Design a protein with these regions (language model features):
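Surface/interface-facing alpha-helical segments and adjacent flexible terminal/loop regions used
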Residues: 2-249
Length: 249
């Protein structure tokens, strides 16, 4: 991945790095934590980006989520829904998921006239429109970090997938700086990530999830929504712990 380009997606089951771990208990390697965060953010980016392929569905069906059990109730709820749904997959599963994804996250279906497209500005602006104030803030954050979307992607920059990719990139940057003994630089990236998570993901994700749950029809995407909520909440704690450990705050 080019460090100055926002990647399009990661493939669930191949790049989610579940065995890398997010345990911040004594003895956990910081690099392992950072890689685990990055990989999981990449998986979430993929899940909200576009309908899954058959290969992605099959990969997720055999993915071992056990290392993450007990993170929090929301995460456990989400994993339970996802794994139970995929346990009963059949020849029509991919199409069923594609229809559900398109209905909810591509905005082809609404609830009381409102869609659940995963854009921050839709949920953080009074008008509920694309490309409002938060969009410009996100664009500025990418620019400051020397990141940009891949050419050909016409989604606005405040799409949830891009927000997750930003978090993944910043986690790996912090990891690389630690490898180079640049602790101060790593802490700066982690502080940036912590602020970005709070301001541009946690600030609107609950409202997005609430609306999406009124539209999605499959247990799989109900699980994805809960899993993401649990992970974001957990990562806020992880970032606090990492900054405290590295900067002594």
């Amino acid at each position: 991945m080019d460090d100055n380009e926002m990647p399009e997606k990661a493939v669930p089951g191949e790049a989610c790095g579940l065995n890398a771990g997010l345990d911040t208990a004594p003895g956990a390697e910081v690099a392992e934590v950072l890689e685990g965060r990055a990989a999981f953010y990449e998986m979430l980016a993929s899940l909200f980006f576009k309908p899954l392929t058959q290969d992605q569905v099959d990969a997720m069906a055999v993915q071992d989520f056990s290392p993450y059990q007990g993170i929090n109730d929301a995460f456990d709820e989400g994993i339970n829904h996802v794994t139970r749904y995929l346990r009963k997959r059949h020849t029509g599963t991919r199409q069923e998921l594609a229809c559900d994804f398109t209905s909810a996250f591509a905005g082809t279906k609404t609830y009381e006239g409102k869609s659940a497209v995963p854009y921050e500005s839709v949920f953080n602006s009074e008008e509920g429109l694309l490309c409002q104030g938060s969009y410009h803030e996100v664009y500025a954050a990418y620019k400051q970090a020397s990141l940009h979307k891949r050419e050909g992607l016409d989604f606005p920059e405040d799409h949830l997938s891009f927000l997750c990719q930003f978090m993944a990139v910043m986690s790996r940057r912090a990891m690389n700086k630690l490898d180079a003994d640049d602790v101060e630089g790593a802490v700066e990236d982690l502080r940036c990530s912590r602020e970005f998570l709070g301001r541009h993901i946690l600030s609107w994700y609950p409202a997005f999830e609430e609306r999406a749950l009124l539209i999605v029809g499959t247990r799989f995407y109900r699980g994805v929504l809960a899993m993401a909520r649990g992970f974001f909440a957990f990562d806020a704690e992880v970032l606090d712990g990492l900054v405290e450990e590295l900067a002594g705050e």
